[in-house]
């Protein structure tokens, strides 16, 4: 698979379960709560630093295997 990349959470809507990550290079990436690794309530906060892999989703590139760093 792809190499891990780093980025920053642009925004995340807890009610809808998705948001966007701004990678260190490239365009913003869609992120779904199912792609967040960890236990419990899966959410991200604006400005959080994250690492992830880029995968092809239904509507283009998106972040997967997201971890807060």
Curated annotation (Swiss-Prot):
PROSITE patterns: CSD_1, CSD_2. Coiled coil: none annotated. Induction: In response to low temperature. GO terms for molecular function: DNA binding; nucleic acid binding. It is found in: Cytoplasm. Residues 7-66 form the CSD domain. GO terms for biological process: regulation of gene expression. The keyword Cytoplasm applies. The keyword Cell membrane does not apply. Keywords: Activator, Cytoplasm, DNA-binding, Stress response, Transcription, Transcription regulation. It comes from the Bacteria. GO terms for cellular component: cytosol. PANTHER family: COLD SHOCK DOMAIN PROTEIN 2, COLD SHOCK DOMAIN-CONTAINING PROTEIN 4. This is Major cold shock protein CspA. It comes from Pseudomonas aeruginosa (strain ATCC 15692 / DSM 22644 / CIP 104116 / JCM 14847 / LMG 12228 / 1C / PRS 101 / PAO1). The lineage of its organism: Bacteria, Pseudomonadati, Pseudomonadota, Gammaproteobacteria, Pseudomonadales. The gene is cspA.
């Amino acid at each position: 698979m792809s190499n891990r990349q780093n980025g920053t959470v642009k925004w995340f809507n807890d009610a809808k379960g998705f948001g966007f990550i701004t990678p260190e290079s490239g365009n913003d990436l869609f992120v779904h709560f199912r792609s967040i690794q960890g236990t419990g309530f899966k959410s991200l906060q604006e400005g959080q630093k994250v690492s992830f892999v880029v995968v092809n989703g239904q509507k283009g590139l998106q972040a997967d295997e997201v971890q807060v760093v």
